[in-house]
């Protein structure tokens, strides 16, 4: 069972009574056939549920109103099978607060050249019925997604499935609670921001809990539960000599397990699915949570360090979006560069907290090493290299009057040398189009040093996310040129300034 099993998408057919009951009967039959086929064959992430035909303003308004109040409904897919006068949709679309996709399709793929008549033409009017619907969306300044293609086309299936992931993620985000253990890292700007504005825009709430509250739960974990979890560590990871039974750092592993169990219990009891920590606020914890955070991220929790609640929420959102897809998604930080002509590289990592979902296939190493930051006992962590291939890094920043999503397309590469003295998980990549352009563009656009790194999602996914939440997106990829990029930032400033 995945998070998508908690939601459904409603399939709504637009028509009218002008064509008579026989035409509406055929429309209903076609709709039932298409929905059944899509649910059976299209490999969609969640179920399509066919709703009654929308043939009058009252019927359409009722469907939209019901969608708003049904928590299982993640969004609407609308098919204009015949011509459906768009003024009938105004009241419904005015109140609709769920994502909307217009499936611009028709029941038949090929025209029946020898038998086509006006009855056929009146029944299969997507070509201009869809345009009428598109006009009212543009007139109402309501942007919605559009997918064109026959309902049996695999590319159309993939695009609908991708949109469904966004719709479910948006609905889930409305219930997302972010827990900050402690506050923001002192004096850091980009990790701060307006939590009220974020809740208005995205729906997630952000609140702080004292580390002492967490410590109470951690200390309540039984030794039996700790030992059982450490047994799991033994089977899942390659333990260094220091972390094995009778090893000099074995107690640190036991404490890390206790912290993991305590954090998970605290998060479950509070209904949290994202959280932050900061090394400046660890009072009562014996070590900075490293292993615990890594494993919780792998289980689907959002996380970011230093109180960075925006990145923690974004990671959770992207975890939901990518559920079931190949590749992982993790908290990340651009840490240091390798400058070499024609082979500039970025080494990404964090103090400890990189998600094992992006790791290469061999078992991660579980080790305990000294950490100079935080002033606590040496923390346990998983050490691994990252899978290679195309990926993205994304950053969500608060500009005061709006949110900006930055996305850099990257190519993850194999680490060319061993890193015997670097005891943390890491990722190595080439930034597109090149490191000077990518880094300068990122800095000019105000991108954070914390990002969400993903092999599972791509630029199109993030474009859909930005459109669905009506936020600015700034893209850095192989097509980026700095003069045009700077112009786009200036144009966006004017555009969003007019919208205030």
Swiss-Prot record:
It is an enzyme of class 5 (isomerase). PANTHER family: L-ARABINOSE ISOMERASE. It comes from Escherichia coli O1:K1 / APEC. GO terms for molecular function: L-arabinose isomerase activity; manganese ion binding. This is L-arabinose isomerase. HAMAP family: Arabinose_Isome (MF_00519). One of its GO terms (cellular component) is cytosol. Its cofactor is Mn(2+).
């Amino acid at each position: 069972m995945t998070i998508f099993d908690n939601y459904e998408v409603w399939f709504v057919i637009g028509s009218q009574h002008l064509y008579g009951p026989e035409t509406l009967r055929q429309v209903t039959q076609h709709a039932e056939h298409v929905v059944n086929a899509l649910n059976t064959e299209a490999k969609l992430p969640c179920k399509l549920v066919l709703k009654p035909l929308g043939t009058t303003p009252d019927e359409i308004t009722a469907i939209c109103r019901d969608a708003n109040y049904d928590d299982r409904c993640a969004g609407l897919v609308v098919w204009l099978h015949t011509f459906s006068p768009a003024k009938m949709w105004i009241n419904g679309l005015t109140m609709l607060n769920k994502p909307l996709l217009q499936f611009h399709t028709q029941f038949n793929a090929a025209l029946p050249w020898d038998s086509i008549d006006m009855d056929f033409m009146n029944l299969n009017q997507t070509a201009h019925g869809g345009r009428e619907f598109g006009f009212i969306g543009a007139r109402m300044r309501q942007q919605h997604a559009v997918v064109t293609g026959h309902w049996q086309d695999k590319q159309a299936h993939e695009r609908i499935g991708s949109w469904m992931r966004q719709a479910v993620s948006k609905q889930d985000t409305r219930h997302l609670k972010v827990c900050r253990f402690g506050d923001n890292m002192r004096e850091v700007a980009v990790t701060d921001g307006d939590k009220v504005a974020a809740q208005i825009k995205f729906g997630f709430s952000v609140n702080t809990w004292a580390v002492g509250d967490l410590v109470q739960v951690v200390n309540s974990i039984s030794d039996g539960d700790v030992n059982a979890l450490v047994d799991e560590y033994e089977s899942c990871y390659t333990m260094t000599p220091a972390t094995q039974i009778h090893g000099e750092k074995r107690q640190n592993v036991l404490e890390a397990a206790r912290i993991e169990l305590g954090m998970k219990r605290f998060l479950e009891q509070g209904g949290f699915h994202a959280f932050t920590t900061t090394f400046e606020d660890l009072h009562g914890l014996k070590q900075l949570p490293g292993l615990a955070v890594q494993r919780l991220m792998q289980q689907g929790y959002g996380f970011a360090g230093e109180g960075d609640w925006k990145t923690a929420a974004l990671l959770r959102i992207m975890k939901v979006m990518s559920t079931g897809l190949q590749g992982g998604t993790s908290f990340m930080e651009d840490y240091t560069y390798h400058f070499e002509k024609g082979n500039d590289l970025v080494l990404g990592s964090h103090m400890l907290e990189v998600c094992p979902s992006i790791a290469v296939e061999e078992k991660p190493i579980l080790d305990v090493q000294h950490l100079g930051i935080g002033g606590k006992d040496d923390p346990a962590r998983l050490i691994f290299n990252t899978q290679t291939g195309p990926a993205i890094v994304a950053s969500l920043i608060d500009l005061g009057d709006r949110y900006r999503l930055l996305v850099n397309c990257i190519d993850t590469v194999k680490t060319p040398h061993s890193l015997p003295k670097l005891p943390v998980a890491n990722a190595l990549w080439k930034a597109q189009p090149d490191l000077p352009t990518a880094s300068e563009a990122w800095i000019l656009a105000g991108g954070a040093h914390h990002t969400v790194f993903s092999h599972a999602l791509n630029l199109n996914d993030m474009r859909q996310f930005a459109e669905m939440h009506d936020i600015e997106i700034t893209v850095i990829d192989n097509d980026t040129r700095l003069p045009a990029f700077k112009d786009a930032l200036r144009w966006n400033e004017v555009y969003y300034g007019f919208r205030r």
